[in-house]
Amino acid sequence: MQGKIIKSLAGFYYVESEGQVYQTRARGNFRKRGETPYVGDIVDFSAEDNSEGYILAIHPRKNSLVRPPIVNIDQAVVIMSAKEPEFNSNLLDRFLILLEHKAIHPVVYISKMDLLDSPEEIKAIGRQYQAIGYNFVTSLEELLPLLADKITVFMGQTGVGKSTLLNRIAPELALETGEISDSLGRGRHTTRAVSFYNTHGGKIADTPGFSSLDYDIANAEDLNEAFPELRRLSHKCKFRSCTHTHEPKCAVKAALETGELWPVRYEHYLQFLSEIENRRETYKKVIKRK
């Protein structure tokens, strides 16, 4: 039989197949090979009834996230708050390049719009992201149609209202929500386990909130690919390996001068590129010491 793991708990994997859910375990040979089934995996399994079965094989994965481990994701809703905590375009772009690199379609959702005196600044930022090609939504009514026929994860900085949003989407989840800490200005982590839930014509999963992200982009070429607007322009650069920093006849810098490119995103690209180069230098020093 073939199915999808929709929940992992205490060594059991709950596999959905043809409308039924089977409780399974992974055979010992997975552990010997260093393989672990994850929520989202397509698996072959055997089961005589719903109470007990065994996973026999794991199909190849199209993508994965590691905190917590979840695989084969169609899209990710990145939740950013308009206020408390303040909207942070740098953090948003870190989420976006991670998702682009993982081939996961991003959707940007802005929470707490009601706390703003005027929504115009956020809406203006939204128009910039929409011009790049991203879905940028500020209401539940805009978000819900995007969930149909997709496996969707939700991510965002702690305290942005992720559990609150999920409870509005699927009240049966009854997820615990955390208040913002006055001393730190951050929310408490309130989500723990990961499961898929059927709702609004698709499947949704919860992931813990993050205040920072580590991305595994290792070079300028991969970083360029993670910025759609740079990716579209870079083939016009004189040099194929152009980093869009100092090279002559750079199409990205030309677009920046004409106003075609949003300066905020270019600044973030330069910052992330610098971080990648610094990590590479640190790694070289460590290797030399060995």
Swiss-Prot record:
Keyword Nucleus on this protein? no
Transmembrane found in the keyword field: no
What general EC class does the enzyme of this chain belong to?
Answer: hydrolase
Query: Where does it primarily localize?
Result: cytoplasm
Residues noted as binding Zn(2+) in the record, renumbered to the chain: 237, 242, 244, 250
CP-type G domain location is 62-213
Binding locations of GTP: 111-114, 156-164
Q: Cofactor stoichiometry and binding?
A: Binds 1 zinc ion per subunit.
Q: Which cofactor does it need?
A: Zn(2+)
Q: What is its EC number?
A: 3.6.1.-
Q: Where in the cell is it found?
A: Cytoplasm
Which cellular component appears as one GO term in the record?
cytoplasm
Q: What's this chain's function?
A: One of several proteins that assist in the late maturation steps of the functional core of the 30S ribosomal subunit. Helps release RbfA from mature subunits. May play a role in the assembly of ribosomal proteins into the subunit. Circularly permuted GTPase that catalyzes slow GTP hydrolysis, GTPase activity is stimulated by the 30S ribosomal subunit.
- Assembly and partners? Monomer. Associates with 30S ribosomal subunit, binds 16S rRNA.
Q: What is this protein called?
A: Small ribosomal subunit biogenesis GTPase RsgA
